């Protein structure tokens, strides 16, 4: 994908950048002129990303480690753009939900977003920089899905966190929005939804009749990061083919 938006000279941090949506966002921002720091807990993914796009600065870090995150993200900044993409999906029936699933999911999907955003926003404010933050949420924040009790809950919490962030950071010229995709055809998405019966049941609920491609989500993120959306904050951009209206 060749983005037609310019981020020349702007500093960007992308979490969960080793694979899928986060990786594609990091590459797209780099091609659009941004100075990108790509964060992942998997060193091999970062190594292959840097080979693909040598201008990217890798940052290997587990966001569940609060103190390490404070030190590493603080030292890597300041940033003007932030994409909180890192997430886990530990799917279990409600009656079998484990403490481990709850703690890990909220650590990564909610607590890490709050913490990274605090670090980055404080630096933006200290530097007098306007900025944009995009939190990658999900249609699951607004629609119950079987076996998704914890995941749906973390994404719902993320949506409300984003709205409060938008309210409190707006006076500092920092915009905060979410993108809320349906199933996305990342490598993992293609594997998880390869069963025709399972995928057909979901696609039948999507008016456009298809799952999202990675570029569909990347384009939405780039728009929300860009000055093209200068008056947009506190919003959730649905990238769901109409799933939520069906």
Curated annotation (Swiss-Prot):
* Domain of life of the native organism: Eukaryota
Q: Does the keyword Oxidoreductase apply?
A: yes
Q: How is the protein altered post-translationally, as described in the entry?
A: The N-terminus is blocked.
InterPro entries named in the record: L-xylulose/Carbonyl_redctase (IPR051737), NAD(P)-bd_dom_sf (IPR036291), Sc_DH/Rdtase_CS (IPR020904), SDR_fam (IPR002347)
Which residues take part in binding substrate?
138
* Keywords from the named record: Carbohydrate metabolism, Cytoplasm, NADP, Oxidoreductase, Xylose metabolism
Subunit record text: Homotetramer.
What is this protein's function?
Catalyzes the reduction of D-erythrulose to D-threitol with the concomitant oxidation of NAD(P)H to NAD(P)(+). NADH is less effective than NADPH. May also catalyze the reduction of L-xylulose.
Name used for this protein in its record:
D-erythrulose reductase
Q: Where does this protein come from, organism-wise?
A: Gallus gallus
